[in-house]
């Protein structure tokens, strides 16, 4: 008996020292995490308190947003860091980096009629370009798509197949004065050229309706366009927040992430406060348990400007360190008001774009979560248009959830998920209306429980999960022009 008490005393003394990278206080006495137990720790009131905090952070600043490098995002980063650090369960760090911020506005008129346009971020500025409009063929991704008389004219290009940046570059190579990209699905179009490039020309976005109307007008006669683009640029310091459980096998890391920044236009409570708070809620709930595999949470910066934070992080890891990450889970927009329960198509069965080995199994796990409760779900395009992109480019298995952005809900989807047909999943996407009032409480609660379900499964065991592919480079650029949603900003950021 004496020896048992001595052993216990030694164990408690060791735990109380709180050695960094070792198990936190009380670890041996915590129950092993299970899917049911972790899900039961998820409370809607905690989720809503989190999104309301992000709203208050945005409201505290005149810009009313949480765009990277701005005061709203700086406060977001500090709050997340302090909340997770205070648990004592994680080793937490802020990963500093500098990225180029851009803000752009555009006006476009055709034959004297004003159109509702948005400028692509990182677009070169333009002061009252007046030129004839011509149409590019085949989505404008190749030099042969541009008419011989493109020089000095503004070119109209349909979205799809290649990135906005590539379209702008091809237009520049054809010596166009500017480019207008119109959507290939209903709704307006906002995005980014992905960075500065001397090949780019001033570039704006239009809705599918306005773009098709212009194409029809050109077919029947001359269309003169006036285009203005105002662009601002600034190098900004910003941070990822990375938190890893002190306990668990650090050579078998389960990683999940969500971007913590918003667009300039608003507070970004669904995009992506919902994902940020979803994983934070799970991170806090996980502190009640011990686990076998370490879990690493990430809150990414600057997703809205081209997946910059997650790409910076992945590029900071050599192959040996990245190989410790056995899978990556991404959660971006999980509380859309007119939601659909969507799972990244890791096996490629719906969109013919497969992820690295293990991505299919992640998809099947989320399918099981919904199926076991009799809840409908559907695949969403696994195209690399969110923060998982940098991971799958290095051959890390990935998956995740998404409840929809600007794509319009169909009558068939209404039968599955309820809501309103003919209305976007999130009509306030990338707008000032993306506030707490924009959150569907049922969707965010359900999807946060799904996050908990997946974390508990993989933190407990990777038994049956495919052997981690060798870390390397992998092409994930899709070649689909009509592919519906695949995430938030990434759906319109690049393509």
Curated annotation (Swiss-Prot):
Cofactor(s) needed: Zn(2+)
Entries under SUPFAM superfamilies matching the protein: PA domain, Zn-dependent exopeptidases
Boundaries of every PA domain copy: 130-216
Location, primary (coarse class): secreted
UniProt entry tagged with the keyword Transport: no
Glycan-linked positions: 142, 235, 272, 352
Binding site residues for Zn(2+) 1: 259, 271, 332
Record key words, sorted: Aminopeptidase, Glycoprotein, Hydrolase, Metal-binding, Metalloprotease, Protease, Secreted, Signal, Virulence, Zinc
Record-annotated site: Transition state stabilizer: 429
Annotated positions binding Zn(2+) 2: 271, 304, 430
Signal sequence interval, chain numbering: 1-21
Active-site residue list: 303 (proton acceptor)
Pfam families assigned: PA, Peptidase_M28
Record family assignment: Belongs to the peptidase M28 family. M28A subfamily.
Role according to the record: Extracellular aminopeptidase that releases a wide variety of amino acids from natural peptides and contributes to pathogenicity.
Name used for this protein in its record: Probable leucine aminopeptidase 2
Species name: Trichophyton verrucosum (strain HKI 0517)
Chain's gene name: LAP2
């Amino acid at each position: 008996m004496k020896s048992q008490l001595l052993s216990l005393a030694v164990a408690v003394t060791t735990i109380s020292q709180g050695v960094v990278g070792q198990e936190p206080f009380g670890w041996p006495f915590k129950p092993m995490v299970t899917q049911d137990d972790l899900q039961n720790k998820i409370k809607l009131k905690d989720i809503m308190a989190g999104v309301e905090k992000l709203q208050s952070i945005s409201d505290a600043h005149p810009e009313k947003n949480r765009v990277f490098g701005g005061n709203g995002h700086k406060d977001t980063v500090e709050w997340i860091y302090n909340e997770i650090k205070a648990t004592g369960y994680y080793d937490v760090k802020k990963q500093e980096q500098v990225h180029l911020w851009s803000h752009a506005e555009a006006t476009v008129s055709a034959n004297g009629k004003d159109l509702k346009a948005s400028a692509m971020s990182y677009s070169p500025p333009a002061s009252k370009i007046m030129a004839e409009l011509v149409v590019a063929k085949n989505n404008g991704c190749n030099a042969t798509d541009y008419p011989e008389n493109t020089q000095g004219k503004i070119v109209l290009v349909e979205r799809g197949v290649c990135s906005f940046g590539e379209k702008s570059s091809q237009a520049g190579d054809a010596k166009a004065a500017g480019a207008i990209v119109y959507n290939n699905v209903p709704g307006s179009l906002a995005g980014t050229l992905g960075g500065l490039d001397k090949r780019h020309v001033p570039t704006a976005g239009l809705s599918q309706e306005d773009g098709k109307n212009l194409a029809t007008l050109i077919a029947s006669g001359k269309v003169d366009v006036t285009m203005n683009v105002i662009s601002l640029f600034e190098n900004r310091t910003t941070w990822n927040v990375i938190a890893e459980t002190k306990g668990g096998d650090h050579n078998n890391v389960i990683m999940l992430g969500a971007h913590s920044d918003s667009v300039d236009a608003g507070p970004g409570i669904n995009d992506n406060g919902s994902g940020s708070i979803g994983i934070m809620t799970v991170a806090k709930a996980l502190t009640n348990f011990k686990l076998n595999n370490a879990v690493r949470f990430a809150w990414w910066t600057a997703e809205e400007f081209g997946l910059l934070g997650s790409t910076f992080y992945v590029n900071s890891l050599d192959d040996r360190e990245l190989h410790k990450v056995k899978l990556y889970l991404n959660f971006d927009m999980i509380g859309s008001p007119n939601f659909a329960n969507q799972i990244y198509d890791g096996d490629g069965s719906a969109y013919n774009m497969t992820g690295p080995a293990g991505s299919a199994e992640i998809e099947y796990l989320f399918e099981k979560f919904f199926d076991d409760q009799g809840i409908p779900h559907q695949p969403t395009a696994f195209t690399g248009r969110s923060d998982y992109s940098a991971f799958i480019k290095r051959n890390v298995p990935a998956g995740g959830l998404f409840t929809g952005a600007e794509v319009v809900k169909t009558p068939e989807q209404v039968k599955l998920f309820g809501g309103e047909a003919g209305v976007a999943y999130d009509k306030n996407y990338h707008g000032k209306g993306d506030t707490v009032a924009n959150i569907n409480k049922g969707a965010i609660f359900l999807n946060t429980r799904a996050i908990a379900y997946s974390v508990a499964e993989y933190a407990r065991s990777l038994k049956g999960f495919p052997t981690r592919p060798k870390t390397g480079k992998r092409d994930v650029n899709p070649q689909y022009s009509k592919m519906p949603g695949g995430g938030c900003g990434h759906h319109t950021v690049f393509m």
